[in-house]
UniProtKB/Swiss-Prot annotation:
Protein location: Cytoplasm; Membrane
Tissues with expression: Brain and interlimb region.
Pfam families named in the record: Sprouty (PF05210)
Protein name, as recorded: Protein sprouty homolog 1
GN (gene name): SPRY1
Induction: By FGF signaling.
One GO term describing the cellular component: cytoplasm
Amino acid sequence: NPCSCSQSHCCSRYLCMGAMSLFLPCLLCYPPAKGCLKLCRGCYDRVNRPGCRCKNSNTVYCKLESCPSRGQGKPS
């Protein structure tokens, strides 16, 4: 039992756990921190980076007005 005070070397165990808590933070803090980061990035992008954020931004789309209809551009 690492948190027991009755066993020997309890001070060294507590110092070790304290040092580990600095480098390995509580895993319960990870999802809220990740959500906060996503929210902050979204707000920053909305303010400073206007425009489309489509996943398929390399795909070329044709507007209906500029595309020839099926019967019109074909040679007869």
